[in-house]
Amino acid sequence: MKILVVGANGQLGARCCALLVEAGHDVRGSVREPARGEALRALGVETVLADLTDTSSIRAAASGAEVAILSANPVVPRAGDRPALVEEGLSRAPAVLAAEGVGRIVLPSVPVTDVDEAVPFVRARRRLEDALAELRAETVCVRFPPFMDVHLALAGSSIPLRGAQNATVDRPSPFLRSFRKSTGTLVEDRGLILVPGRRSHRNAFITVDDAARAVVEAATRDDVGGLPHATLEVAGPQPLSWDEVAATYGRVLGRRVRVLATPAVVYAVAQKVLRPFAEVPSNTMALNRYGASSETAWRNVGGGLLDPASMTTVEEFLQEKVRLPD
């Protein structure tokens, strides 16, 4: 099967490419610069230059593809990126892909919350989901809880990044790098974990690897429930509160780990104050607000796409990572 991965050098997209190649599919991955495709080409991925802000490049990338995975997003922009322009390009992409004959489009997405409309990325994602539902092509929106590889790192730990390739948290984003410089090892160094929202909030955390496996299943299986326009929630193996995450870190590190929680209202105020003159920091505060306002205590482990017994728990993830070199 010929499968296009849009945003192939991102953490999720790159893992999808690797799994698809392993499964014997003909994989094409879009990247914005040739150098970003070197590792993908080494895996056997055909790389093409495409930019979501250039519709013609997306059209060319889609030529001959049977399935497309839209893994690109502007959540962690590089210096000089314009998130709003990327979102505009993403909003056009489904119709372009369908017009080129793509028969199924898979969109990794995020949980629904009461603050979706106040968060630019999430608001745009809902519009994208709506656009997919209007297409003649088959579409699958796969909503995920927080990724362990990302959210446990942003909570103040470098452990989730050990051995990671194409890590979202390591992208060359000036704002994120500044934040990580002061908070990147708080858990290991000071026994302190930074939590958005209430410490009692529960999330069915999932690894990027398990999420990629779910996306690949959604892209390639004939028996996906809900087609032609499916929306699936894929829970990780167990819902944990942030207190339970801290306790898990404590067992892994052999020390007490305390929770420092920040209320959603703090992020909402910061988002509003920063909006007129600092788009990226404002959007980041909006995402923190979103995270602080949501819970994913889902019980549908694997979402019908993965065997629950095959999925990685938070403790298994951290135990595996802590054995790797820094």
Question: PLM features: residue spans?
Answer:
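Oxidoreductase cofactor-interface core, primarily capturing Rossmann-like NAD(P)-dependent enzymes
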Residues: 2-11, 15-26, 55, 76, ...
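Terminal hydrophobic/aromatic helix or amphipathic segment near a protein terminus
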Residues: 239, 244-295
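SDR active-site strand-loop-helix element
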Residues: 6, 30, 71, 105-110, ...
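Short, amphipathic alpha-helical "lid/cap" segments that border enzyme active or binding sites
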Residues: 55, 59, 90-94, 208-216, ...
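Short, hinge-like loop/turn segments at secondary-structure boundaries
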Residues: 45-48, 65-66, 123-125, 157-161, ...
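Amphipathic terminal alpha-helices
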Residues: 297-326
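NAD(P)H-binding glycine-rich loop region in Rossmannoid oxidoreductase-like domains
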Residues: 29-100, 114
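General small-molecule cofactor/ligand-binding pocket signal
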Residues: 48, 142, 258-262
